[in-house]
Curated annotation (Swiss-Prot):
Pfam families documented for this protein: RlmL_1st (PF22020), THUMP (PF02926), UPF0020 (PF01170)
InterPro entries for this protein: DNA_methylase_N6_adenine_CS (IPR002052), RlmKL-like_Mtase (IPR000241), RlmKL-like_Mtase_CS (IPR053943), RlmL_1st (IPR054170), SAM-dependent_MTases_sf (IPR029063), THUMP_dom (IPR004114)
Enzyme Commission code(s) on record: 2.1.1.-
Record-annotated THUMP domain positions: 53-164
Protein's name in the database: Putative RNA methyltransferase slr0064
Length: 384
């Protein structure tokens, strides 16, 4: 059995990875979950906390991808340097040869400029140490590894971290049925936060696709921990895993769930199959029968209440559909909002400035957001 001395500190530093542009609101969420010394950095947030906090963040965070536990920074001038440095670490403290392994590598320097090659050096150093000691070694598993190690190359050093999460938290596990170019769940939650939506406000997505905005809103409204849908977390394979603590956090989360939404949620889309997918996704996450779904073309939508928040993610020509064909549709979005949704606040998320100009309404706020490498903007319209 690995010894647990590497995990013995009461509180320790962690790093949560997050989409670029979402660092500040992720830092706010982590603070609300109990993190201390919270510091937004590039594409992530550094913080400190105890084991209970680590578990709680994996269970409850709606915005981050994963939580890394930094374990060592070693010399990495070139491949030989990195191999020697990695092999000096006592890997017995972290896992045993019976456990499966995956190495994820980011960053580069002039000598280590290919992430797959760098990951191979890290893996070779670890399994060679195991073979020298035990005549057996951890197998690599790229699908469902027990242990995931993150190696980040910066200048002539490599920062090594244990990944506590495993499957990225944006893959909630509730969404087997996808529409075209779906939003990541973490991004949908972040956009709802930016929009100032809270569970007591009615919400309508007239271009709902597979339902991501509404599913994330529903989970918030019912106080359901998004992490409960994950198949498992890597920290459960760590030598210091506290089963009783984890069970207690799960029980507390379950006890705090609500049965009814605090305000109505509506979703419509012109594609019947997509609406069926959204209903199926809702069923997977305790939201079956709680959200109003309707097959409806955008031109035919009407406000389902006197006031509320409307949010949508129309196609913007980069991935689905061609830009030229979308200009008229964006103009229609503006016309429908202006003529029918007085008293509402609308948000349109798009990655195409030329198209959003066709909406023809004055924005009251703009929030820049990165979506899978595409610079996008969340546009706010106060409809009077």
């Amino acid at each position: 059995m690995p010894d647990t001395s590497a995990f013995s500190a009461t509180t320790r530093p962690y790093f949560a990875t997050v989409a670029r542009g979402l660092e500040a609101i992720a830092a706010q969420e982590l603070t609300e979950l109990g993190a201390e010394q919270v510091k937004p950095e590039f594409a992530g947030v550094a913080f400190i906390g105890d084991r209970a906090l680590l578990y709680r963040i994996n269970l409850w965070s709606r915005l981050i991808y994963r939580v890394l536990m930094p374990m060592a920074t070693v010399k990495a001038f070139n491949a030989q340097d990195l191999y020697r440095s990695i092999k000096k670490i006592d890997w017995d403290e972290y896992f045993s040869p019976e456990q499966t392994l995956q190495i994820n590598c980011t960053g580069k320097n002039p000598q280590l400029n290919h992430s797959h090659f760098t990951a191979l050096q890290v893996k070779n150093a670890i399994v060679d140490q195991q073979r020298d000691r035990y005549q057996r070694r951890s197998s690599v598993d790229l699908e469902q590894p027990d242990i995931v190690i993150n190696a980040h190359i910066h200048q002539n050093h490599c920062q090594l971290s244990l990944d506590s999460t495993g499957f990225s938290l944006h893959r909630r596990g509730y969404r087997p049925a996808l529409g075209n170019a779906p939003l990541k769940e973490t991004l949908a939650s972040a956009l709802l936060t930016m929009a100032g939506w809270t569970p007591e406000l009615p919400l309508y997505d007239p271009l709902c696709g597979s339902g991501t905005f509404l599913l994330e809103a529903g989970l918030q409204s019912l106080n359901i921990a998004p992490g409960k849908f994950q198949p498992g977390f890597c920290f459960q394979q760590w030598p210091d895993f506290d089963q009783d603590l984890w069970h207690s956090l799960l029980q507390t989360a379950k006890a705090g769930e609500r049965d009814t939404l605090q305000a109505p949620l509506w979703g419509s889309d012109g594609d019947r199959e997509v609406i069926q997918a959204a209903k199926s996704n809702a069923q997977q996450c305790q939201l079956g029968g709680k959200i109003h779904w309707q097959k409806l073309n955008f031109a035919d939508i009407e406000p389902p209440a006197a006031e509320g928040v409307l949010i949508c993610n129309p196609p913007y020509g980069k991935r689905i559909g061609q830009e030229e064909a979308l200009g008229d549709f964006y103009q229609q979005i503006g016309d429908v909002l202006k003529q029918r949704f007085r008293g509402w606040t609308a948000f349109v998320f798009s990655g195409n400035k030329a198209l959003t100009k066709r909406i023809g309404l004055r924005t009251s706020a703009r929030f820049p957001v990165n979506n899978g490498g595409l610079p996008c903007t969340l546009l706010k319209y106060e409809l009077y």
